[in-house]
Amino acid sequence: MSAATDIVDAAVDAALVLAAEGTWRDISLRQIAEKAQIPLVDLFARASGKNALLDRLSARLDAAALATAATPSEDVHDRLFDAAMARIEAMEPHRSALTSIYLGRAALSLAPRFPRTARAILEAAGVDATSPRLIAMTAVWVRCAQVWRDDTGALNRTMAEIDLRLKQMRERLGKMGAGF
């Protein structure tokens, strides 16, 4: 791992701590650098704003979904479910911070990250991310992330939502001739 990667990852970790403790919109890059004990000039050279840190965080969380690619299962639904749940489980320890980030930003500014996550879930499941599938999986992911934010306890509501939405996605894509 390079020094640049270490700096950005340390800043992401610090940003998560600060977001869990406060309001995301009120947190500055300077505060993140201070919390991470990184000179602001070094952080700024590698991540010039909080969006860059959110991109790195999203990539780290997507890696959890991609790690399920080695999970053997004949059923595509099960592979998609496992990948989506791996992403959710990676998010779970950071629930307070992620909720602060979501509430502290316009939801639309987070939207560009959703297709990347959808692609990671599809690819982890061995499903070619064609345009219709990517659009459908993005819609599934957005809804499931909303349910997760409101879910408490053992994630039963989240798991049920993922299961339902994946079944609906498969059925609708099949009707369009874009199924898997």
Task: List where the protein language model places each region.
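N-terminal intrinsically disordered/low-complexity leader segments
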Residues: 1-6, 179-180
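Helix-turn-helix
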Residues: 4, 10, 14, 18-56
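Alpha-helical DNA-contacting segments of helix-turn-helix folds
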Residues: 19, 47, 51-64, 98-101, ...
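Solvent-exposed, amphipathic alpha-helical segments
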Residues: 10, 14-22, 64-68, 140-151
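C-terminal peripheral helix-coil segments that are non-catalytic and often amphipathic
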Residues: 150-180
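Amphipathic alpha-helical interaction segments
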Residues: 10, 31, 82, 86, ...
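Hydrophobic alpha-helical connector segments
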Residues: 67-104, 113
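Amphipathic alpha-helical packing segments from all-alpha helical-bundle domains
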Residues: 105-142, 160-161, 166
